[in-house]
Amino acid sequence: MKRWLSRLVAAVLLVAACPAPSPAAPGAPVVRTVGDPRAADRIVVLVPGVGTTPENIDRGHGGVRRRSPHWQARQLHTACGGQVAVVAWLGYAPPGGVDLAAVRSERAVAGATALTGYVRQLAAARPDATITVIGHSYGSLVLAYAAARLPVQVADLVVLGSPGLDVGAAEQLDTEARLWVGSAEDDWTRRIPEVRILGLGHGADPGQPSFGARNLDVTGAVGHDGYFLPGTTSLESLAAVALGAS
């Protein structure tokens, strides 16, 4: 009972600290492709999170290059030796910041439907390809809601800097794909309360051993948005998964 009350208090405080959510207006999907997914044997789809917009998908949120999904796609493509086509996909409206929209799941649910449709199109165009989907930040929640509906060509799901997946264990995602979790030691999402009450918060930390996911070595990653930095074990680990390592 004491634990439940502490979680309730945490949820109430979290909501009290957040402004009202801004309206979602995803518009047309914005996609950046590095390599040719129509010809590649392996394809990666990157799903970005909080603060990503069509205007900053190339330059990065706040003008910070490592936050750019397009830049991240280029780093992963290079780390894979050019053997993998990498797509930065922005087909939903991420929360603009750590606000009420970010602690709720409506945008992730809507985004999951769009993501599922996009990945199915990729699989239909290239049925023999192996696909990996990587969700960063709130994008990991989009991935979680899409997991059970993704095509069989999706062999691996990777979540980075996740605020939670709205489930208590990996098996609840109802997918045959392998689930990998990476979280940098100084990623602020590690401090998020493991709360999901009245539709607020995203629940258990998927990086905990009890969750049942595979641990991804992200040594060298910096903060919440440094998972694709060149020369890091983190980027090497992502490339290994994309190339089919077990």
Language model features with spans:
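Short beta-strand-to-loop junctions in surface cap/lid or active-site-entrance loops
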Residues: V31-A40
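Secretory targeting and sorting signals
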Residues: M1-P21, L157
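Short beta-strand element of the alpha/beta-hydrolase
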Residues: D41-V50
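Lipolytic serine-hydrolase domain surface
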Residues: P37, V50-T113, A123-A129, R149-S246
